[in-house]
């Protein structure tokens, strides 16, 4: 004896409407055998559509048991129900429920995508089905370009795509004229003859008369039923068999659908992209400027030498030192006798006026020693530097910075010429190489260098030193050497700490920390823009889910699992964010290059770019998850009923 394909035992369905329990189905008992053509007929509100939703695994009974091929489906997980719909059921709806963004062939292919069918085989299958239904010339027409009858035939082809062992037709002729309606009924009768089990939902007795068995419903109960006509039916098989969908194929399809959806709402997509683009570009530009400023400052400080100790007069933590007379040349000479010292040099600075012919230049005088080039790591450009002999003989010789040379001599050769320094004659013996700006932004080339003995006697008028700069040999002993100098000077100054020692390595570390803090601040400000862009992505995706609720219902009805819907909307969010991130990287690099061209120091590194793009990608994941989760958890019945 043949067993029923579908069996309902005492099935009831209760809805909670505004706190009031409404029983739509009441104790339904029903058996449907393979190959039957059954019409369930009733007036509006009789419960027939609710019954169809339960039969098609779109809804669950509140009470009772639903058996399919002898196995209970009432307690199956949503994904198991999706598999059952995908492999066993095909739906034909009164309002067609085609996805407007897809053409006829693509609409028919939808169930096969979730069945894991390859691109070629599902395209071939869709074309064969549409051709057999007289739509071979309408493969690439969208629903809006098809008549009602043609749209319903596309819906029938979609129902048959995965085999359609059971065809559930909900008022399939309700929106059609009589001729088109009759054509659809003839198609259903032919499918019944081929072995498909047809369950027709209708309120029209004429339409119901095409079925082999009619079941009448009223007020949620079966009021009349004909006995089933059990006959041998052809076994309907899935054209794709049982297979597991490839993750790569799923991702490819989700990506393709994402781009199609974004293209359909191009203006909105551009606005959403703009938020991510601005955020990513801001991060890259801000970090490039911050790193550029940090490196520029560090380069200038490092140019002075990382092995430098600077000793200045004045109490520790006090400010100002120009009028404090505590350091003398003998202190410098004593320091030179210590271990681990390459050289020590004095520096006395003063603003002076230089003159050559009719050209005047106000500049900075630095009265220093012959060790200047070694300690400052500043090579001579041309000529010679003054020597220890020049210092001992109080020689009136001078070495010019490039800025002073150009101001006084233009393109002429300055070597050997005499200039006036505060009306005292000095001979030019050398010109320094180009140095550029200092850490504080001052022009280091706007300087003249003279022996400290000569400068103290003729120009400054005092022998006290403004500072002593010491070059240390072994950097690993920098701290030890600093302590030795401190002890030496403390002893020489009678135990009074009237001097300050600054370690350039410590200064570089402090500056680096300060600049890193500034860079983080700039990056944080820019990251806020990226956060705002992410909120924009979430907002647009929530709107997209609302607008495409019916599409989601269609996809669930045709076999999409929760993960398929989650993937699709999550990938849409990621595509927007990643595309915005990519454009933002390009624009960020372009703006950084423009800023660099205007003279602002900029430093390019891979990490900020990777970080900014990665943040955009993660932003898409994080802010896209909530809308995607909302889409994946939609009730298919509610989704299909939405407008």
From Swiss-Prot:
Its main location: membrane. It is found in: Cell inner membrane. Pfam families: ABC_tran (PF00005), FtsX (PF02687), MacB_PCD (PF12704). It is a multi-pass membrane protein. GO terms for biological process: response to antibiotic. PROSITE patterns: ABC_TRANSPORTER_1 (PS00211), ABC_TRANSPORTER_2 (PS50893), MACB (PS51267). SMART domains: AAA. The chain crosses the membrane at residues 270-290, 518-538, 569-589, 606-626. Residues 6-244 form the ABC transporter domain. GO terms for molecular function: ATP binding; ATP hydrolysis activity; transmembrane transporter activity. Belongs to the ABC transporter superfamily. Macrolide exporter (TC 3.A.1.122) family. Non-canonical ABC transporter that contains transmembrane domains (TMD), which form a pore in the inner membrane, and an ATP-binding domain (NBD), which is responsible for energy generation. Confers resistance against macrolides. This is Macrolide export ATP-binding/permease protein MacB. It comes from Wolinella succinogenes (strain ATCC 29543 / DSM 1740 / CCUG 13145 / JCM 31913 / LMG 7466 / NCTC 11488 / FDC 602W) (Vibrio succinogenes). The gene is macB.
């Amino acid at each position: 004896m043949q067993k029923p394909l579908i069996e309902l035992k005492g099935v009831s369905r209760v809805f909670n409407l505004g706190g009031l329990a409404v029983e739509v189905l009441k104790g339904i008992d029903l058996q449907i055998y393979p190959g039957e053509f059954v019409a369930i007929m009733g007036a509006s509100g009789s419960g027939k559509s609710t019954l169809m939703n339960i039969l098609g695994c779109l809804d669950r009974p509140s009470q009772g048991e639903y058996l399919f091929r002898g196995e209970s489906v009432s307690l199956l997980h949503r994904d198991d129900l999706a598999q059952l719909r995908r492999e066993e059921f095909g739906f034909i709806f009164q309002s067609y429920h085609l996805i407007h963004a897809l053409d006829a062939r693509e609409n028919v292919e939808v169930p096969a995508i979730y069945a894991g069918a390859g691109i070629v085989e599902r395209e071939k299958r869709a074309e064969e089905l549409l051709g057999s239904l007289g739509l071979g010339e309408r493969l690439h027409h969208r629903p809006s370009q098809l008549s009602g009858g043609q749209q319903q035939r596309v819906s029938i082809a979609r129902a048959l795509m995965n085999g359609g062992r059971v065809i559930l037709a909900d008022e399939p002729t309700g929106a059609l004229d009589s001729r088109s309606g009759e054509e659809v009924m003839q198609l259903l009768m032919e499918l019944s003859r081929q072995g498909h089990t047809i369950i027709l939902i209708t309120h029209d007795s004429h339409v119901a008369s095409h079925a082999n068995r009619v079941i009448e419903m009223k007020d949620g109960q079966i009021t009349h039923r004909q006995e089933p006509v059990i006959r041998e039916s052809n076994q309907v098989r899935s054209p794709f068999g049982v297979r597991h969908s490839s993750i790569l194929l799923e991702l490819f399809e989700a990506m393709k659908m994402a781009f199609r959806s974004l293209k359909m709402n191009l203006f909105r997509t551009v606005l959403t992209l703009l938020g991510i683009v601005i955020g990513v570009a801001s991060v890259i530009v801000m970090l490039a400027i911050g790193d550029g400023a940090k490196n520029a400052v560090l380069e200038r400080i490092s140019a002075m030498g990382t092995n430098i100790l600077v000793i200045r007069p004045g109490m520790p933590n006090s400010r100002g030192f120009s009028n404090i007379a505590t350091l003398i040349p003998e202190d410098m000479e004593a320091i030179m006798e210590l271990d681990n010292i390459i050289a020590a040099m004095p520096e006395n600075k003063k603003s002076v006026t230089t003159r050559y012919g009719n050209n005047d230049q106000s500049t900075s005088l630095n009265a220093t020693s012959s060790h200047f080039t070694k300690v400052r790591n500043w090579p001579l450009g041309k000529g010679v530097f003054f020597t220890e002999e020049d210092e001992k003989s109080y020689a009136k010789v001078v070495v010019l910075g490039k800025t002073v040379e150009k101001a006084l001599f233009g393109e002429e050769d300055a070597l050997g010429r005499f200039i006036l320094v505060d009306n005292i004659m000095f001979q030019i013996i050398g010109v320094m190489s180009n140095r550029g700006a200092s850490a504080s932004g001052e022009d280091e080339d706007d300087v003249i260098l003279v022996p400290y003995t000569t400068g103290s006697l003729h120009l400054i008028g005092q022998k006290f030193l403004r500072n002593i700069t010491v070059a240390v040999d072994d950097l690993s002993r920098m701290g030890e050497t600093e302590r030795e100098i401190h002890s030496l000077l403390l002893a020489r100054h009678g135990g009074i700490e009237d001097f300050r020692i600054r370690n350039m390595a410590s200064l570089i570390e402090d500056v680096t920390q300060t600049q890193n803090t500034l860079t983080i601040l700039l990056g944080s400000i820019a990251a806020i823009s990226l956060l705002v862009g992410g909120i924009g992505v979430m907002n647009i995706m929530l709107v997209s889910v609302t607008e495409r609720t019916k599409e989601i219902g269609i996809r669930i009805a045709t076999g999409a699992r929760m993960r398929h819907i989650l993937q699709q909307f999550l990938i849409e969010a990621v595509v927007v964010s990643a595309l915005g991130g990519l454009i933002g990287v390009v624009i960020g690099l372009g703006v950084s290059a423009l800023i660099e061209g205007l003279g602002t120091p900029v430093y390019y590194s891979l990490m900020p770019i990777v970080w900014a793009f990665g943040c955009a990608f993660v932003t898409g994941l994080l802010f896209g998850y909530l809308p995607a989760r909302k889409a994946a958890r939609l009730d298919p019945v509610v989704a299909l009923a939405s407008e």
